[in-house]
Design a protein with these regions (language model features):
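N-terminal targeting or signal-anchor segments and their processing/structural boundaries
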Residues: 2-646
Length: 646
């Protein structure tokens, strides 16, 4: 009996194994398995049933079920499937074999058209054949709203397509709707920044884009946004388009004329930006022996007031403020204060109320203490001196009497020089502390003439926005060599430190090392700033003058060109502010690469708005590349073409 039972189990296992092998062989011969097992499956899934029916009116059911003729899947449902009106509670989207179900968790609104836009997310499970752009829709009222609004969202600063940002419509035309009410209708941008809002009712709307971090479909400070002051009025008209049917990847089979409804507007461009943080608070304070520094979270025109509680601040400090007063350094002009370990300060500055954003004056008491006390700094200095003296004794034993005085810490100067400069550049000098005195008679600039150096004129000026930076202006001659000599003690710092003797030789590149680019900017005035780009880096920047942007002494290489409208004249691009209704400054790209050659002059005309913004940025500069769309692939025709070619 045990032997019979063993053989029965053995035969049963063998039969199961053979059945599995047979199934595998059959599957290999099944359509969709590849070139060795018959033709590819190129048929997209077909909808066989929708419950409730597509386009139902007066609908009350919150669950939608769609049945197909084959197993299907949804690609990236969280990004591609969009329900409108927006749902506060996330819809539940499920796939099970040949069925897809979507259950809305929010209560249905009366008299409203609902759309579930699947985009190209639905494919079959064998060859990923896409159903195509599919939108399910129904209405809780007596009619369906079918209008559409489409366009692109671009980053305002660099015209990059913004992927995955929400775009919404408000029928409430008040500016406050964006911050207090969820959108009426929504869509989401694809990788090209394109959006299409469906199921829109006739009427007037304001349109917005929103990177909705907190998921409430309303703008919250700090989120990326875009807005338009224009009123959006959806409309439509009958139109004709020509669809191309391909025999394979290179041959056209048929060009088909298709009548369709053309919805407008379909070319909106929203420029997305993040507002500057205008909430001003004191971020931190820092004390070094020779100075103390304060950092703020935002700029302000107000200059903080320092009142010394244990020292005389009126005569003991020198202020070095950044352009927006967001970083301020207070240099200690009195050496007694440098030695004082603790400085107590009543510090009055402009802060911002977090809720109302209104400025007010805040006074804090700051206790400013350096990392190392004066006593410890003196002890470390004494240790360094002892080491030097030991070294001195060793040098004396070797008969070396060249360094008889202890080293004194000099005033440091940094010169931004690469060995050569452009004829249109100047030399920049940076100090490590403010200068108490500069003797320009101890600065010497020489031009090399044959084998000797001849003194030439120059000007030395302190930069407007810092006490530490200076620019030396010279009348540079292309192709010539120069020598800059700065005598010791030419510059004396606030601490009494003096600079060392300084010599540097440099050359000015010749005219034949450069090219020139002259751009005529149609319709542009002096608010337009034009930039030469190497990738993302700005190589040169000029302001338009008399309708032209002229780039002299330009190094030979490939460039791209960007322009922005500098509305406030600060020479840099500025973001927008929704509360003030201020758009970010306009940005444009010249759509082609420009190659500058040595000893060549290039003339180029550019009309800033010749192309829509979404088509301006050269493809080589676009970082946000488009997704690979789920499109029919015609694999069988392609395989036959390869066979014929082989």
């Amino acid at each position: 009996m045990r032997s019979t039972h063993f053989h029965t189990r053995h035969l049963t296992g063998l039969v199961c194994t053979l059945l599995c092998v047979a199934c595998m062989l059959l599957s290999c011969a099944n359509p969709g398995s590849g070139p060795d097992g018959g033709p590819y499956d190129e048929t997209p899934p077909r909808i066989v049933q929708m419950l409730p029916a597509l386009g139902n009116t007066g609908e009350r059911a919150r669950k939608v079920t769609i049945a197909f003729d084959e197993p299907v899947k949804i690609d990236n449902a969280s990004e591609k499937v969009i329900v409108s009106p927006p749902q506060i509670n996330m819809p539940e989207i499920k796939t099970s074999g040949r069925r897809i179900s979507v259950e809305l968790m929010d209560s249905l609104k009366p008299g409203t058209t609902y759309t579930i836009d699947f985009s190209d997310a639905i494919t079959d499970c064998t060859e990923n054949n896409p159903l195509g752009n599919f939108t399910y829709y129904f209405s809780t009222g007596t009619q369906l709203d079918t209008m559409e609004v489409a366009g692109h969202v671009l980053a305002a600063e660099n015209l990059e397509p913004v992927k995955g940002i929400m775009v919404g419509l408000h029928s409430n035309m008040a500016d406050s709707a964006f911050t207090t009410l969820p959108f009426d209708r929504v869509a989401r941008t694809d990788a090209n920044g394109h959006f299409c809002i469906k199921g829109v009712a006739p009427g007037n709307y304001h349109i917005y884009a929103l990177k909705d971090v907190d998921g409430d479909f309303k703008y919250t400070r700090g989120e990326m946004l875009a807005f338009s002051s224009e009123t959006v009025v959806p409309s439509s008209f009958p139109d004709v388009r020509h669809d191309t049917l391909w025999a394979d990847t290179i041959r056209i089979d048929t060009i088909k004329t298709v009548n369709y409804t053309h919805f407008m507007p379909d070319n909106l461009v929203l420029r997305a930006f993040t507002e500057k943080n205008n909430t001003r608070q004191l971020l931190k304070s820092q004390r070094e022996p020779a100075y103390f520094r304060t950092y703020f979270t935002a700029p302000s025109a107000h200059v903080p007031v320092v009142r010394g509680l244990n020292f005389d601040a009126a005569h003991g400090i020198v202020e070095d403020r950044s352009a927006g007063n967001d970083t301020i350094t207070y240099w200690l002009a009195d050496t007694a204060l440098v030695k004082q370990d603790s400085l107590m300060v009543a510090y009055t500055y402009e802060a911002t109320n977090d809720s109302t954003l209104q400025p007010y004056l805040q006074t804090d008491t700051l206790c400013l203490v350096p990392q190392f006390s004066y006593e410890r700094r003196q002890r470390l200095a004494a240790e360094d001196l002892a080491k030097w003296q030991k070294g001195l004794e060793k040098r004396h034993k070797r008969g070396d009497f060249s360094q008889e005085k202890p080293p004194v810490k000099p005033l440091k100067m940094q010169l931004a020089l690469r060995g050569s400069i452009n004829p249109d550049e100047n030399m920049h000098i940076t100090l490590d502390e403010p200068a108490a005195r500069i003797d320009t008679t101890k600065f010497h600039l020489y031009l090399k003439v044959d084998t000797t150096y001849k003194a030439v004129p120059f000007k030395l000026r302190r930069d407007a926005h810092t006490l530490l930076a200076y620019t030396l202006y010279g009348e540079w001659r292309p192709g010539q060599q120069y020598l800059l000599n700065i005598d010791s003690t030419a510059v004396t710092g606030l601490s009494g430190a003096v600079c060392n003797n300084f010599d540097t030789k440099f050359s000015v590149a010749g005219d034949d090392s450069y090219g020139s680019l002259f751009m005529t900017i149609a319709g542009a005035d002096s608010t337009c700033v034009v930039q030469l780009l190497q990738g993302d880096k700005v190589a040169k920047q000029v302001r338009v003058k008399n309708g032209r942007a002229d780039f002299y002494y330009t190094r030979p290489t490939d460039y791209y060109v960007r322009a922005f409208i500098d509305a406030n004249g600060n020479n840099r691009w500025d973001t927008g502010c929704y509360a003030e209704g201020r758009q970010p400054e306009m940005v444009y790209y010249y759509p082609h690469k420009i190659t500058v050659r040595a000893n060549w002059d290039i003339e180029q005309t550019w009309q800033l708005d010749a192309l829509p913004l979404n088509r301006q940025k050269p493809a080589e500069l676009v970082k946000q590349k488009g997704d690979t769309k789920n499109t029919p692939r015609n694999l069988n025709a392609e395989r036959e073409r390869k066979k014929r070619g082989g």
